[in-house]
């Protein structure tokens, strides 16, 4: 039988006393009362803060959104299938944040900034809050630099500036996403970081966009944040804020960014679902009362920063889908009132073969010509005026059979101008190409052509100027002015190309 030695026991006790750590760990915990539909009701969590992250014992993370007298309403960032009634929950003391770094460029991630493209983890040393305050009045400066989309109809008549928020609105299948992706493609070589946020889209649609960007080398400067239609409502609600946080990271590092939200109405639907399940009182169209704030705090983060902050910018292009052209629905009117203008795409124009199907009459940019270079201002004014007169005359001409020669000429010119606004998808034009196209149309050089020949002639003219008159593009890009020298070069090119074209025909 082993002998018990008193000195050994006293040594062990002394050692334990010396090693005793007095540190008291206070954990704010609670118990799950009920779980389902992506919502959990928690008893306890007395000191939890609004928007704080909470962790369930099986690892799921949630956000405390409803703080009530007897329980806390938590939305889950996952399916929560393993959460049971009675399981414990602890408050983390943190609010939602994501890692950020240059390594995210070229990747496809989810709302929690986790990669979903199967290309491994993304390294980052910094993190950023998903929801951060928008720059104040003193931190901003007015928009003055153009953000070229490569689409004549937009760059000439509805110009977008760096730091602007321009809504793209229209029915389904009218080419809204195509306008946005063309804008991304046109940023190649312009040192603009692009973020495309897909909210509640079909996974196949997102894959199509990613493939289109990869094929044309645009993923090098693009980040895609995607939460598909089968994602939990919480993640669809968070995705735009994740995209904004990534764009802000680059903006505050003196870079220019472009962010596309496709589309915020799906985010509003996800937020409505969460709010109704949390038993918040419904308002118009069953949306909660703060749905305007949902979008305003997101879109206000787009800005052109002051010179003290490095003059970085974040340009936002939210895309909103309307139901049979109803722009006066709740979400469209909300977003229209927050943004600095809208580009309206019409199903009728799209079906008539006018693509991009931009209705120039009701589209507007509240920044206007401040976001255009001088050369574009010189030629775009005449185009706007002539198209407006043409639209008026066309409506009038439907009721009248005998029109005088001047009216017939004006209608013929208008039809050719409308033709020059047509562009194939994924074929953006440089500013110089746009200027020569508009100048050719507004100065009557297309009047002698059949409407069917206009696009072919313009394509050949652009190639001709690029190869035979490279000085034209050099003058426009260096001086940003449509000088007399550039005008003379262009006139010569048009005459020479016209002769060649007529010989071919």
Curated annotation (Swiss-Prot):
Q: How does it sit in the membrane?
A: Peripheral membrane protein
SUPFAM superfamilies on file: C-terminal domain of alpha and beta subunits of F1 ATP synthase, N-terminal domain of alpha and beta subunits of F1 ATP synthase, P-loop containing nucleoside triphosphate hydrolases
Major place of localization? plastid
Q: What is its EC number?
A: 7.1.2.2
Ranges that cross the membrane: none
Where is the site Required for activity?
363
Q: Does the keyword Translocase apply?
A: yes
Q: Which reaction does it catalyse?
A: ATP + H2O + 4 H(+)(in) = ADP + phosphate + 5 H(+)(out)
Keywords attached to this entry: ATP synthesis, ATP-binding, CF(1), Chloroplast, Hydrogen ion transport, Ion transport, Membrane, Nucleotide-binding, Plastid, Thylakoid, Translocase, Transport
* Annotated binding of ATP, by residue: 170-177
- Gene Ontology cellular component terms for the protein in this record: chloroplast thylakoid membrane; proton-transporting ATP synthase complex
State the compartments where it is located.
Plastid, Chloroplast thylakoid membrane
Q: Which Pfam families match?
A: ATP-synt_ab (PF00006), ATP-synt_ab_C (PF00306), ATP-synt_ab_N (PF02874)
In the record, what terms sit under GO molecular function?
A: ADP binding; ATP binding; proton-transporting ATP synthase activity, rotational mechanism
Q: What does this protein do?
A: Produces ATP from ADP in the presence of a proton gradient across the membrane. The alpha chain is a regulatory subunit.
- Protein family: Belongs to the ATPase alpha/beta chains family.
Fill in the subunit field for this protein.
Answer: F-type ATPases have 2 components, CF(1) - the catalytic core - and CF(0) - the membrane proton channel. CF(1) has five subunits: alpha(3), beta(3), gamma(1), delta(1), epsilon(1). CF(0) has four main subunits: a, b, b' and c.
Mind telling me which NCBIfam families this protein's record contains? atpA, PRK13343.1
Output the PANTHER family linked to this UniProt entry. ATP SYNTHASE SUBUNIT ALPHA, MITOCHONDRIAL
Q: HAMAP family, per this entry? A: ATP_synth_alpha_bact (MF_01346)
Q: What is this protein called?
A: ATP synthase subunit alpha, chloroplastic
What organism does the record attribute this protein to? Oenothera argillicola (Appalachian evening primrose)
